[in-house]
Amino acid sequence: MKKIVIIGANSFQNPLILKAKEMGYETHVFAWKDGSIGERTADYFYPISIVEKEAILEECRRIQPDAVTTIASDLANITVQYLAEQLGLPHNSDNCIYISTNKFAMREAFSKHGVPTPGFVSVCEGDDYAAAVADMQFPMIVKPTD
């Protein structure tokens, strides 16, 4: 039976867990135990935080999965890419992960390729915030880049 590692076990990842099982995969799921619906639906559940890449990698070396994946989580994508790379499995590039997990880089990539996106600027500590947003209109949303 093929084995799949899924990073994350909340309500967003649970449909992925169920689909993988339906497709005949043995599911190995990593996440915090609290609030992890996937703990009940996965074949194997490991109560390890999705940011503890080395601890998960150690388990993955024992499991020897055929694939590592996630869904609906920027943070989990970072771990998936790291694990897959270390295990010699197909994975996204470092640049792809950076662009998909950094809001400013993502907006720049969208703009560069003609994908409609709201106006955006990057502002760092010490910058003149008023000048940076002077040409923007309200309502305005302020978010961290990661």
Question: What positions do the PLM features span?
Answer:
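ATP-binding N-terminal substructure of ATP-dependent carboxylate-amine bond-forming enzymes
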Residues: M1-C96, D127-A130
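Active-site nucleotide/adenylate-binding loops and adjacent lid/helix of ATP-dependent enzymes
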Residues: N102-D146
